[in-house]
C-alpha cells in the first residue's frame, strides 16, 4: 500500500507542477513593447519624445520629462483633446501619437487661434514633406527623426528614424533610403496618373470644338 501511495504521489506531483505553470502562463498579462510617442504641455511650449509600453508608464515619464510635480493630470490627444484614460484605448493608438498633459485647471485649446471655415482647403502643391527631430534620451548620438510626406493633401505616409548610435544611424539610413525609394515610386505613379488626366482633358477639348464647327458648317 505504501509503495502504491508513493507511486501515485510521484505521478501527481509533476501534473500539479505542470498545472501551476500553465496557469501562470495563461493568466500572466501580456507585456506590450515600448513605443515612441510625443508629449507636450498645455500651451505647446515644451515638447518631448517618450518611449512607453503602457498608459501609466507614459504618464509617469511625461511628468519627469516635462518636470511636472503635481500628480493630478489628464492626458488628452493633442489634435482634438480626446481624453485618454483607459489602457484599452491607449493600446489602439499608433506610434508617434501626439499627446498633451493637462494639470488641474488647464483646458485643451486648438493649436491655431483662428476659427476654421467650412470652405474646402486649397491645394498649395502636389507634395509636402515635414521633418521632426527629437531625442528620447539625452545620451543619444543624434536623436530621432520623423519624416512625414503628404501628397495631394490626401495621401500621407510617415517614417520614424531612430539614430541612437553609429550602427543604428547607418542601419536607419539604409532603411530610410529603401523606404524613400518606395515612396518615390508611389509618387511617380500618382504624378503620371495626374499628367495623363491633364493630357486627356486637353485632347478632348479640341476634338469637341472641331465637332461643333463641323455641325455648324453642315447646317
Swiss-Prot record:
Residues 163-180 are annotated as: Amphipathic helix. Residues 33-110 form the CIDE-N domain. InterPro entries: CIDE-N_dom (IPR003508), CIDEA_N (IPR032936). It is found in: Lipid droplet; Nucleus. PROSITE patterns: CIDE_N. It catalyses: a triacyl-sn-glycerol(in) = a triacyl-sn-glycerol(out). Expressed in omental and subcutaneous adipose tissue (at protein level). One of its GO terms (biological process) is lipid storage. GO terms for cellular component: cytoplasm; cytosol; lipid droplet; mitochondrial envelope; mitochondrion; nucleus. Keywords: Activator, Apoptosis, Lipid droplet, Nucleus, Transcription, Transcription regulation. GO terms for molecular function: lipid transfer activity; phosphatidic acid binding; protein homodimerization activity. Signal peptide: none annotated. Homodimer. Interacts with CIDEC. Directly interacts with CEBPB. Interacts with isoform CLSTN3beta of CLSTN3; inhibiting the lipid transferase activity of CIDEA. Belongs to the CIDE family. The amphipathic helix mediates embedding into the lipid droplet phospholipid monolayer, promoting phosphatidic acid-binding, thereby facilitating triacylglycerol transfer. The CIDE-N domain is involved in homodimerization which is crucial for its function in promoting lipid exchange and transfer. This is Lipid transferase CIDEA. It comes from Homo sapiens. The gene is CIDEA.
Amino acid at each position: 500500500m505504501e509503495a502504491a501511495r508513493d507511486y501515485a504521489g510521484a505521478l501527481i506531483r509533476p501534473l500539479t507542477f505542470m498545472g501551476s505553470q500553465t496557469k501562470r502562463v495563461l493568466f500572466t498579462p501580456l507585456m506590450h513593447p515600448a513605443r515612441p510617442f510625443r508629449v507636450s504641455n498645455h500651451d505647446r511650449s515644451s515638447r518631448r519624445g517618450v518611449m512607453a509600453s503602457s498608459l501609466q508608464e507614459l504618464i509617469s515619464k511625461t511628468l519627469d520629462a516635462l518636470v511636472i510635480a503635481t500628480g493630478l493630470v489628464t492626458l488628452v490627444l493633442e489634435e482634438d483633446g480626446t481624453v485618454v484614460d483607459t489602457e484599452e484605448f491607449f493600446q489602439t493608438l499608433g506610434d508617434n501619437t501626439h499627446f498633451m498633459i493637462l494639470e488641474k485647471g488647464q483646458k485643451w485649446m486648438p493649436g491655431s487661434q483662428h476659427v476654421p471655415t467650412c470652405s474646402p482647403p486649397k491645394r498649395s502643391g502636389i507634395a509636402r514633406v515635414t521633418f521632426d527631430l527629437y531625442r528620447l534620451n539625452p545620451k543619444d548620438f543624434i536623436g530621432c527623426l520623423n519624416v512625414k510626406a503628404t501628397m495631394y493633401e490626401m495621401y500621407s505616409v510617415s517614417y520614424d528614424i531612430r539614430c541612437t548610435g553609429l550602427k543604428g544611424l547607418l542601419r536607419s539610413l539604409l532603411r530610410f533610403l529603401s523606404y524613400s525609394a518606395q515612396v518615390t515610386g508611389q509618387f511617380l505613379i500618382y504624378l503620371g496618373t495626374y499628367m495623363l488626366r491633364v493630357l486627356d482633358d486637353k485632347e478632348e477639348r479640341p476634338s469637341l470644338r472641331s465637332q461643333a464647327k463641323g455641325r455648324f458648317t453642315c447646317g
